[in-house]
């Protein structure tokens, strides 16, 4: 059985980029296809990211950020309040850590994006951090394959790459978005993953590493939904939920402006509780009337001797993902939020979609 001490911390970045072609979609998201031989979510389309490494909080980063950006915050703004995201899963900065937790997680996401996709979210060391426009990814360096191999073998080499390019990780371009904890039973490997968002003016060149990642797609939120329903791609429930949440924004500028004007004071991290019904399953999320706060379901699922449709019909206050099949999810939502970030709208698949599944 997996316990709290066995959870692995991770960071992922949702890259939203402008689109040069005529299209009603205001932006597209980078989704990477994981290789089938991967232990966790084989074949899935995911946002770039990976596991936090000790190298991501190395004190050597301090001198690279200097002199323009100094500790402890390196210009990120006020430190977010520390509070447990879930009982038994409190993560504060390690005692004596050279970098704050949210800085290290950003470096992790940027490093993993380079490893998996060859995209460099860096900026010149002497550049100002403030910008009223989305960022631009750095062009891949000469010897991309060699550098990527070195970083994959030893994450400390990512700092060497940044020093070689006279750049720093563009931690200021990554905005807090939220986070997800792997629910019980999804996999023997469980992750505490911070979700970040980065807006880019244009789509950068993507070069999958052809090891962990074998392909990629740039898709608008609506396109990603359609590709999922048509079985062209597979999304895990958290990715599907976030794709639908991003549907709230009509354009890249609206999304970027929201990130600048509404920084999250306390980024939420959710643990879905899996409710097993007699004919399917439902992922219950915080705020749902059936969601149980506390650690009771950290290591087990809920179950009920009712059909999924009965549970859906009875629901009054809901925030849930109904899993009908691997390629058919529905979102039921009655909660309200003061901002676009809050929640996705309810989403039920069209009958034409269900007929072909």
From Swiss-Prot:
Binding positions for Mg(2+) per the UniProt entry: 112, 116
UniProt cross-references to CDD domains, sorted A to Z: NUDIX_AcylCoAdiphos_Nudt19
Principal subcellular localization: other
Enzyme class: hydrolase
GO cellular component: peroxisome
Residue positions of motif Nudix box: 97-118
Site (described: Important for coenzyme A binding): 34, 40, 189
Protein keywords: Hydrolase, Magnesium, Manganese, Metal-binding, Peroxisome
Stretches assigned to coiled coil: none
Catalysed transformations (reactions): an acyl-CoA + H2O = an acyl-4'-phosphopantetheine + adenosine 3',5'-bisphosphate + 2 H(+); CoA + H2O = (R)-4'-phosphopantetheine + adenosine 3',5'-bisphosphate + 2 H(+); hexanoyl-CoA + H2O = hexanoyl-4'-phosphopantetheine + adenosine 3',5'-bisphosphate + 2 H(+); octanoyl-CoA + H2O = S-octanoyl-4'-phosphopantetheine + adenosine 3',5'-bisphosphate + 2 H(+)
Residue list for modification N6-succinyllysine: 300
Cellular compartment(s): Peroxisome
EC number(s) recorded for this UniProt protein: 3.6.1.-, 3.6.1.77
GO MF terms held by the record: coenzyme A diphosphatase activity; magnesium ion binding
Residue positions of motif Microbody targeting signal: 355-357
Gene3D superfamilies: Nucleoside Triphosphate Pyrophosphohydrolase
Names of the cofactor(s): Mg(2+); Mn(2+)
InterPro entries, per database record: NUDIX_hydrolase-like_dom_sf, NUDIX_hydrolase_dom, NUDT19
Primary role: Fatty acyl-coenzyme A (CoA) diphosphatase that hydrolyzes fatty acyl-CoA to yield acyl-4'-phosphopantetheine and adenosine 3',5'-bisphosphate. Mediates the hydrolysis of a wide range of CoA esters, including choloyl-CoA and branched-chain fatty-acyl-CoA esters and at low substrate concentrations medium and long-chain fatty-acyl-CoA esters are the primary substrates. Highest activity seen with medium-chain acyl-CoA esters and higher rates of activity seen with the unsaturated acyl-CoA esters compared with the saturated esters. Exhibits decapping activity towards dpCoA-capped RNAs in vitro.
PANTHER family the UniProt entry points to: ACYL-COENZYME A DIPHOSPHATASE NUDT19, TESTOSTERONE-REGULATED PROTEIN RP2
Family assignment from sequence similarity: Belongs to the Nudix hydrolase family.
Protein known as: Acyl-coenzyme A diphosphatase NUDT19
Organism annotation: Rattus norvegicus
Gene from which the chain derives: Nudt19
